[in-house]
Amino acid sequence: MAKSLQDVLDNAGNAVDFLRNQQTGPNVYPGVPAEYSNWRNEQRAWAKTAVLFNQSYHMVELMVEGPDAFAFLNYLGINSFKNFAPGKAKQWVPVTAEGYVIGDVILFYLAENQFNLVGRAPAIEWAEFHAATGKWNVTLTRDERTALRTDGVRRHYRFQLQGPNAMAILTDAMGQTPPDLKFFNMADIQIAGKTVGALRHGMAGQPGYELYGPWADYEAVHSALVAAGKNHGLALVGGRAYSSNTLESGWVPSPFPGYLFGEGSADFRKWAGENSYGAKCSIGGSYVPESLEGYGLTPWDIGYGIIVKFDHDFIGKEALEKMANEPHLEKVTLALDDEDMLRVMSSYFSDSGRAKYFEFPSAVYSMHPYDSVLVDGKHVGVSTWVGYSSNEGKMLTLAMIDPKYAKPGTEVSLLWGEPNGGTSKPTVEPHEQTEIKAVVAPVPYSAVARTGYADSWRTKKA
């Protein structure tokens, strides 16, 4: 008899220890090499010239179609759908009945009664569960990420063209001036004789477009973009640099799925299988709460307070209404101290007392990194995504901390490494924990992102 996600958690006994010792590392980025040139130049290209991210392989897609599609997605998301119409997209965020974030994906409003969700699996699975168990007149079609399929063929290709020269490259690829789109608006364009969907979007703290279309057009469109980029310094980005781009733009890629705890998600855990995301995901870092609830994050904690709208009925509305005026963690960037980083790295050349290894450019070693942020030894928040930015010349981390300590310039410390020498994850070697001094900085860290994303959730506060 097939096991459910709840069976897996029950059999594990201590769910925190179970997920912290899962035999899975961080998310992988298949389909592209680790580096096309080297990750330093690839990072610098998105700030200096332009890059082409290939997102065709690592994300899940879920088509949602039918007469109830709009109402269905509206009921599951904290976002307002007021004035939401075909040709627009949004960062779609579902929460549990208790108000904890499950994940986020990009929601494309393609046509009347037709939507596409693109991103990581947790939010996708949540939508599938409610479609399967509710009375919604919707049809869902899942297109699985490459790592979990054998045919290598996707429904759509998906590229991100980003950087100061992105507009010039797109102009050359199209043979005409691209449409002037507002942030998160879409239009159809022509590249190499193919119809291409274009979403005005931004990653890595730089302006640009997300481009997508039928898989059969992959080579023609990709080749045309590469050719157009030759005179504009276009760099292809491999998996190593790709995983670090969020450090400059301020998006938290890995909120712990709130459906893994709480009575309000019990039916989901009984429905989800033993191979579902929640049964396989890993947690890493120095922060070890007593229960999975300790990993839960609210929309405000990760900077999504601005998109919480109570103008519609949705799962978790009552819980969020109660939370709205309560204190929340505040999302910040932590800039790790240069000298302390040199101290940590020098430990790698010692016979004993080695700190947890910092991989470059992304030092994330689990699917859900959670490290403690301390002030005078007191826990004041958690750090998530961590890594090195060649553009900034700093080791950075995205963190959520007590607002009392969130003012830029405040000195804190990051507790780096896991307790008791580390867990059994394959990405963890024996090591000792150490505190690394850090300074609170704005989020996004990139000055371009703070200016260019002025009208988005990345910079606004609720």
Swiss-Prot record:
Pfam families noted in UniProt: GCV_T
Origin superkingdom: Bacteria
Induction record: Induced by growth on syringate.
Entry's EC annotation: 2.1.1.-
pH dependence: Optimum pH is 8.0 (in the presence of 1 mM tetrahydrofolate).
Swiss-Prot/TrEMBL keywords: Lignin degradation, Methyltransferase, Transferase
InterPro entries attached to this UniProt entry: GCV_T_N, GcvT/YgfZ/DmdA, GcvT/YgfZ_C, TrmE/GcvT_dom1
SUPFAM superfamilies recorded: Aminomethyltransferase beta-barrel domain, Folate-binding domain
UniProt keyword annotation of Methyltransferase present: yes
Annotated disulfide bonds: none
Gene Ontology MF, one: methyltransferase activity
Name the record gives this protein: Syringate O-demethylase
Organism this protein belongs to: Sphingobium sp. (strain NBRC 103272 / SYK-6)
